[in-house]
Amino acid sequence: MQIWVDADACPNVIKEILFRVANRVGIMVTLVANHHIRVPPSPHIRSTQVLAGFDVADDHIVQQAEPGDLVITADIPLADELITNGVHALNPRGELYTKDTIKQRLQMRDFMETMRSSGVQTGGPPPLNQGDRQNFANKLDTFLVKNFKK
């Protein structure tokens, strides 16, 4: 098992949490992005740069992640595809997507996209706060206790 990170949009504070977890637990963390991502020197952390382009990083993650792996992403369509493939998906706010919740998220995403295309200003998600960071760290720890065996 390893952790994959959709790193193009992943907040730095979440990456820092993942770096600490990788070294503490000994799990491989791979950040995938279409630009260079600086990572600390560690045998448990690596960065993969893919070509720039729409969904290139997402496609790489889908191709490389194996059932049982965990992907950190806020990309709902990516999370849906991963869950279908038996891969776990956790967003940077600490929500572990499931087969049940991902469908609801997709419907809401599509609804908001329809609203935006009709001219309604919907705004984006609020900034990540301390509670979100703590929730992410807690959910990640809980997930790893249940699923990661050295």
Curated annotation (Swiss-Prot):
Domain of life: Bacteria
NCBIfam families documented for this protein: PRK00124.1
Protein name listed in UniProt: UPF0178 protein PBPRA1738
Signal peptide: none
Classification via InterPro entries: UPF0178 (IPR003791)
Similarity field: Belongs to the UPF0178 family.
